[in-house]
Regions:
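A structured, charge-rich N-terminal accessory region that forms the first stable segment of a protein
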Residues: 1-62
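A short acidic (Asp/Glu
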Residues: 12-16, 32-33, 90-98, 121-126
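Long, hydrophobic/aromatic-enriched structural stretches that serve as scaffold segments
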Residues: 53-95
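A short alpha->loop->secondary-structure connector
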Residues: 97-110
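Short, conserved secondary-structure transition motifs
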Residues: 113-131
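A conserved mid-domain beta-alpha-beta active-site/ligand-binding segment of alpha/beta enzyme cores
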Residues: 127-206
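Charge-enriched amphipathic alpha-helical scaffolds
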Residues: 198-199, 220-244
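Short acidic, hydrophobic short linear motifs in intrinsically disordered regions
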Residues: 208-219
């Protein structure tokens, strides 16, 4: 079996050996394309270098090569465990990965490892140690219908056709009902709704321009379904600060 984790913070909690890879992207912002290609990664690299001062060589080695190694290893394994949370940040990554697995013809058993229900939108964050047994307990096997649904979400996400965005307005299948606020949030982003900007403006008014830390904490507490880290929130904060 092979495991793919969403981020290094999760990797540090893993206390078992095996084929473990880390996905180090945040596809919820920046340029995207339906299919992974050299141009796809080139555009992503330019975005993170400009937006987050990332190092080009480190991005290639730690992000691109890591994911390519994962896909190569997957072809030799029958079972894949994808460790991703329910929030928008993680979900967009998950949709992309499932679409790429479909693209390479992966037909093995696909497991989505979800954080304990008790942690809510905080996901794996409160969990200190993760054992191999946890990977079994928290895993949900994705049947072909579920895989197809997530693949459709990815293609809707990258589409520029507003008709495709209708998927984000529909209720998700029952096993994934928790995705409803996540899909609503993405629908609002796609359709130009100012809700997210209004949320940031409200936090600016409450905490002031120097209140980034308490504002970020409040945002995570009340709107955890976005799943944004401090870097993503800082970009939003600075953008609204420049206007206000």
């Amino acid at each position: 079996m092979v495991h793919l984790l969403n981020g290094d913070a999760l990797y540090e909690k893993i206390h078992f050996a095996g084929a473990i890879y880390v996905f180090r992207e945040a596809l919820c912002e920046g340029p995207v394309q339906p299919v992974m290609s050299e141009d796809f990664w080139s555009r992503r690299q330019s975005f993170v270098m400009t937006g987050y001062s990332a190092n080009a060589q480190e991005y290639t080695e730690n992000t691109v090569r890591e994911f390519e190694s994962f896909l190569s290893d997957v072809s030799k394994k029958q079972t894949v465990f994808l460790w991703f949370e329910w929030d928008l940040f993680c979900q967009v990554n998950l949709w992309f990965i499932i679409a790429q697995l479909r693209r390479i013809g992966y037909s093995g058993e696909l497991h989505w490892v979800q954080p304990p229900e008790a942690t809510g939108w905080r996901g794996f964050g409160p969990v200190e140690i993760i054992t191999y047994q946890d990977s079994i307990t928290w895993a949900q096997v994705l049947d072909p219908e579920s895989v197809n649904y997530f693949q459709k979400l990815w293609y809707a996400y990258v589409s520029t056709d507003a008709a495709d965005w209708d998927l984000f307005s529909q209720d998700p299948p029952e096993p994934f009902s928790k995705l409803k606020p996540v899909l609503n949030a993405e629908r609002d982003r796609k359709t130009g709704c100012m809700k997210l900007h209004q949320l940031i403006d409200g936090l600016l008014n409450k905490h002031g321009k120097d209140g980034f830390i308490p504002a970020f904490r409040a945002f995570c507490k009340d709107h955890g379904y976005y799943g944004f880290g401090d870097l993503q929130f800082k970009r939003l904060w600075d953008g609204r600060l420049a206007i206000n």
